[in-house]
Amino acid sequence: MALRLILGFDYGTKQIGVAVGQVITGQARELCTLKAQNGIPDWNQVEALIKEWKPDAVVVGLPLNMDGTPSDMCLRAEKFARRLNGRYNIPFYTHDERLTTFEAKGERRDRGGQKGSYRDNPVDAIAAALLLQGWLDENTALFES
């Protein structure tokens, strides 16, 4: 199956950033931020996104430690990816998301966004777009099948 449209998720315990990427353009953009309670999203909201966008695959960011080893959150992010696959029968991929939140804060600042607290002005969707863009850039061979 050729991949055309992909949703990217920046998994977190309080918020989950969502981005959409198109293989034909090789571009990702932020979509929205979902609330989560202890890492559990409102699955109805997730399902609505899946039905609306009809992705061919999903990419979930892995918050690796700076030395490349898995962080405690990696297990939870991988579990979230498996749940997406189990609920919606969509192939999933994972991608190193180190420093995407830091980079997203800088991008928001460069766009003239508020410099307020992270809680008041989250950057999760920007981080999701950055990790999905990284995945798109590194996996062009998958798009040719």
Swiss-Prot record:
- Provide the alphabetized UniProt keywords: Cytoplasm, Hydrolase, Nuclease, Ribosome biogenesis
* Molecular function in Gene Ontology: nuclease activity
Q: What class of enzyme is it?
A: hydrolase
Query: Which InterPro entries has this protein been placed in?
Result: RNaseH-like_sf, YqgF, YqgF/RNaseH-like_dom, YqgF/RNaseH-like_dom_sf
The family database entries (Pfam families) matched by this protein are listed as: RuvX
What is one process in the GO biological process aspect for this record? rRNA 5'-end processing
| SUPFAM superfamilies, per database record | Ribonuclease H-like
> Matching SMART domains, A to Z?
YqgFc (SM00732)
The Gene Ontology CC terms held by the record are: cytosol
* KW Nuclease (keyword) present: yes
Q: What is its EC number?
A: 3.1.-.-
Q: What does this protein do?
A: Could be a nuclease involved in processing of the 5'-end of pre-16S rRNA.
Q: Which NCBIfam families does its entry note?
A: RNAse_H_YqgF
The entry's family comment says: Belongs to the YqgF nuclease family.
What name does UniProt use for this protein? Putative pre-16S rRNA nuclease
